[in-house]
Every structure is written in C-alpha cells, then in structure tokens.
Amino acid sequence: MFKVDLNSDLGESFGAYKMGMDEEILKFVSSVNVACGFHAGDPCVMDETLNLAKQNGVCIGAHPSYPDLLGFGRRNMQISFEEAKNYALYQLGALFGFAKAKGMKIQHFKAHGALYNMAAIDENLALALCEAVASFDENIIFLGLSNSAMNEAAKKKGLRYANEVFADRAYNDDGTLVSRKLEGALIHDENLAIKRVIKMIKESKVTSINGKEIDLKADSICVHGDNAKALEFVKKIKENLKKEQIQICALENFI
C-alpha cells in the first residue's frame, strides 16, 4: 500500500492578527509545520498551536524562515552560511522549548517561503540548514522539495529526507515551483489537482507547466487551510486518497 503524509503550515497568526483555520485543518492532516516567530507566530500562538496539535494527535515540525515579519518570509535575503545555520537553530530552539514543556517531540523541519525556495536551488544554503538540524537533533526528518538541493544536502549531513510535493502549485521543467508572481502558478481546478496528486504518489511523476513529464517522489503533500474553500479541498484530497487505497500517516511512520 502507498503511504503519504499530509502537511500544513500552522501557527501563523501574530498578536492581534489571526491567520488560517488551524483548529479545522488539524482534523485532516497528519503533520503540521509550526511558525517559529521569524515570519509569523509568537510565543502565545506557538503555545496554542502545540496544544491543538497534541489534542488532535498530529505530529509537529519546525517551520523556520528568514527574519521577515513584514514580508511574511516571502522576500529573499542574502545571508551567510553561519547566519542561515544560526537562524535555523534559534527557531528550532523556540519550538523545542514549547514541545518539551508539553511532552512532545519535533518530528520534522521544513523551511518557509523564500528560505525554502532558495534552499531548493542553493546547496550551500541547504547545507547550512541541514547542519543546524543535524547538530540540534539528527533524528529530525528534513522535509523539502522533491529532487532539490535540500535532498542532496540532507544526504551529506546524514539526515532522513522526506520529499514534499504541492497539491495546488505548478512546476517548472526543472522540478522547481513556478513563482507565485507568474500566471498559472496556482492550480484552481480541484479535480485536476487531485489527479496530479494521485499521479505523483503512484507514478512518481508530474506534468510541468510546459507539458514536460518530471520524475519526483511524493512522501508528503502540502495542503492549506486558509479559508473554508481550502478546507473543503483538503477534505476532497483526503477522501480521494482513501478511495485510491493510499494510507495517510505521519512521516515518522515510514521515513
């Protein structure tokens, strides 16, 4: 039987600003990526997010970013190897404090936004992130874009790697994600998106925005719970995976 993880970004509210439908999305996913304060999230939000994850039996992961609250971590920054490593360690430590206090463990590490996209093509940046994870806890799974520089970096640092794919994003011919700034970056046809997800899991292939067949591996599918429509889409994905006899489970069960 095929196995796959469903992951979603959570804990992205900040102070008086609320973002996402965290409580609702937790009913459908097996892993969550918790914002660690650099792009979103704050101590109280992190505390509440972990409480919700624990109540729902969902595994948690660190979701670190460039230090970019105003830009929600979606703006690129030129930083050194040491800076990247230290930013990652700092944010891992923040999540670890709450996790330890609640008797929870960090299952995985997934970079956010521009940091994720850059680490997918910049092996030096990817190595800095992997070195941070390996020095913090070598049992943490590194979750990153399938067939990217992060995969190679994780191998070099002796980390387990989970290949991530996206249900609603278009791919370039080289396997990277089409920039959100470009037309066609997001797939709005839910039925098409679900067919693509099943193909990625069962055939390890996806069709690029230019019609090219790309090889990739799908260990985890990133889904979103920003609004009611997004939640319904996640529900449809889960229902269709079950119909296809694809088991949904957290990464720690098969990576």
Swiss-Prot record:
Keyword Secreted appears in the UniProt entry: no
Lineage: Bacteria, Pseudomonadati, Campylobacterota, Epsilonproteobacteria, Campylobacterales
NCBIfam families linked to this entry: PRK05406.1-3 (NF003814), PRK05406.1-5 (NF003816)
Cited function: Catalyzes the cleavage of 5-oxoproline to form L-glutamate coupled to the hydrolysis of ATP to ADP and inorganic phosphate.
MF-aspect GO terms: 5-oxoprolinase (ATP-hydrolyzing) activity; ATP binding
Gene3D superfamilies per the UniProt record, alphabetical: Glycoside hydrolase/deacetylase (3.20.20.370)
Record flagged with keyword ATP-binding: yes
Pfam family of the protein (one): LamB_YcsF
BP terms from Gene Ontology: carbohydrate metabolic process
Assembly and interaction partners: Forms a complex composed of PxpA, PxpB and PxpC.
Keywords noted in UniProt: ATP-binding, Hydrolase, Nucleotide-binding
InterPro entries for this protein: Glyco_hydro/deAcase_b/a-brl, LamB/YcsF/PxpA-like
CDD domains: LamB_YcsF_like
Domain of life of the source: Bacteria
Protein name stated in the entry: 5-oxoprolinase subunit A
PANTHER family documented for this protein: 5-OXOPROLINASE SUBUNIT A (PTHR30292:SF0), UNCHARACTERIZED PROTEIN YBGL-RELATED (PTHR30292)
Family indicated by similarity: Belongs to the LamB/PxpA family.
EC number assigned by the record: 3.5.2.9
Catalytic activity annotation: 5-oxo-L-proline + ATP + 2 H2O = L-glutamate + ADP + phosphate + H(+)
Signal sequence, renumbered to the chain: none
